[in-house]
Amino acid sequence: MGYFKRVLLYIIVMVLSVFIIGCDKSSDTSEKSKGDSKEAQIKKSFAKTLDMYPTENLEDFYDKEGYRDGKFKKGDKGTWVIRSEMTTELKNENMVSKGMVIRLNRNSRTCTGEYFVRIVKEDSEGKVYSDERKYPVKMENNKIIPLKPIDDEKVKKEIEEFKFFVQYGNFKELENYKDGEVTYNPEAPIYSAQYQLKNSDYNVEQLRKRYNIPTQKAPKLLLKGSGNLKGSSVGYKNIEFTFVENKEENIYFTDSVYFNPSEDK
């Protein structure tokens, strides 16, 4: 059940990865050299994004400039989109994702978003479907505030205590991560680098402090993005910590910080 649920989210990336890995086997020596080079390029591509971790005061993003392309209209200062999400699926249970996304508009210096709870289920016929509840929020003085009354005290507390990973994550040790599993497709273009972490890793310790992670397995860190590695930084940059991934169970945390054109321009 878990396998099919996650395939819904990652099938495109997985198919491309299989193709790339298959091609990489043609020449071990030459491809290892290329892989090492690509690993360095991927780290460099992520460097400016990861330098924003940590930004404890989210209102600092109102004064942060991001990468622009032709989609930005004249005079648009842009909007930062920040998202953090924890997903847990234990054996014979539904997949539950909880997280928040906010949009910080640099033109109006206002921030709105939503806290969400998504449950992915499988019916008696084997069909997988998603049930999602969203709770609109705003941010004032670096504090997340619900826009509507919430009867569920548990959800209300989760919103009050919520912190985005960009507020406490830290990647100052990125250069010490070595021998990553690298994939790269220049035609898409998409790329990724994956590293096995230890439970003593700072970011892993921080995640365990904030979430009930029902496994002692150390996670893998996956950096995946799109765009031209040789220059353009326009594209997405996603971070994922995968603790468990198999056909019966999935436990992973995802995070992203995007810079997009504003909808009010």
From Swiss-Prot:
Database matches in Pfam families: DUF576
Chief localization: membrane
Lipidated residues (S-diacylglycerol cysteine): 23
Keywords: Cell membrane, Lipoprotein, Membrane, Palmitate, Signal
Topology versus the membrane: Lipid-anchor
Location of the protein in the cell: Cell membrane
Chain residues carrying a lipid of type N-palmitoyl cysteine: 23
Gene3D superfamilies from the UniProt entry: 2.50.20.40
Kinase in keyword set: no
GO cellular component, one term: plasma membrane
Signal peptide feature range: 1-22
Annotated family: Belongs to the staphylococcal tandem lipoprotein family.
Name of this protein: Uncharacterized lipoprotein SAR0402
Organism taxonomic ancestry: Bacteria, Bacillati, Bacillota, Bacilli, Bacillales
